[in-house]
Amino acid sequence: MKLGRAALGLLLLAPSVVQAVEPISLGLALAGVLTGYIYPRLYCLFAECCGQKRSLSREALQKDLDNKLFGQHLAKKIILNAVFGFINNPKPKKPLTLSLHGWTGTGKNFVSKIIAENIYEGGLNSDYVHLFVATLHFPHASNITLYKDQLQLWIRGNVSACARSIFIFDEMDKMHAGLIDAIKPFLDYYDLVDGVSYQKAIFIFLSNAGAERITDVALDFWRSGKQREDIKLKDIEHALSVSVFNNKNSGFWHSSLIDRNLIDYFVPFLPLEYKHLKMCIRVEMQSRGYETNEDIVSRVAEEMTFFPKEERVFSDKGCKTVFTKLDYYYDD
């Protein structure tokens, strides 16, 4: 970049030199400068380029989390600080690795979407954001060796093209044990792996594994008359990581990623209560352009099922199905 600027300056500020240069040579020199310096910048004005989005705004990320994610004070704080700190670190020692755990409908996928949108204009549709779904991309246990090779090649190729690549692994609880260990070299504290640096990449894992342990903690607080906001990360994180590591039905079962402490944060997503469902419904109404109708909000929330059976504290599907239930009341 600096070399291109210097070359352009010499050509513009030294007419005596320019006159002595053959027209063809001068044209080639100018073309080289324009192609190598100016063209990429013009191109990135009209198409997505790696790392071309404006600097990550802490305020914008916090606003998205506050307005779109409900009942998850732990996840909000961890995600905000971890992502903002990582993106603004010019020389991270390793990739950022986040493992999001909780029941369905609590916001795990939504958070990965928010992260992607705050880093790339295209969000989940960006060429630099890659989503893997265990049951879709890695369905057969007999093909684990093949999947490992393919996964390594895919990650290596995409990080080579864009150091700030984001990789999202959904349904980790359904992934075949041992498969995810194939990416261990990319998550470790290496400057280079076969000539490629992975230190600016982001890896996000989504899983239902450990949800029972998270629920136990939340229920204990509720039964003790404590506010869920009083739950601290230290109350859950260690027990969560141990639970996931020892869960034979989890893709992290005895994984070297956990054993070698390569997961930066185990992020617990608490089960949602009745009041949180109503928040989800209101936001969905607003996104569809409807005025908030509290009667409909209450009716939709009351149609959901809750657990434990006797106390009916937490929604068993979170906010996942409130959107389709809302369709019933706005059948155009």
Curated annotation (Swiss-Prot):
The free-text function statement in the UniProt record for this protein reads:
Protein with chaperone functions important for the control of protein folding, processing, stability and localization as well as for the reduction of misfolded protein aggregates. Involved in the regulation of synaptic vesicle recycling, controls STON2 protein stability in collaboration with the COP9 signalosome complex (CSN). In the nucleus, may link the cytoskeleton with the nuclear envelope, this mechanism seems to be crucial for the control of nuclear polarity, cell movement and, specifically in neurons, nuclear envelope integrity.
Q: Which Gene3D superfamilies match?
A: P-loop containing nucleotide triphosphate hydrolases
Q: Which organism is it from?
A: Macaca fascicularis
Q: What is its main location?
A: endoplasmic reticulum
EC code(s) of this entry: 3.6.4.-
Task: Enumerate the InterPro entries for this protein.
Answer: ClpA/B (IPR001270), P-loop_NTPase (IPR027417), TOR1A_C (IPR049337), Torsin (IPR010448), Torsin_1/2 (IPR017378)
- Keywords recorded for this protein, A-Z: ATP-binding, Cell projection, Chaperone, Cytoplasm, Cytoplasmic vesicle, Cytoskeleton, Endoplasmic reticulum, Glycoprotein, Hydrolase, Membrane, Nucleotide-binding, Nucleus, Signal, Synapse
Q: Which gene encodes it?
A: TOR1A
Report which reactions are catalysed by this protein: ATP + H2O = ADP + phosphate + H(+)
Give the protein's recorded name: Torsin-1A
Bilayer topology: Peripheral membrane protein
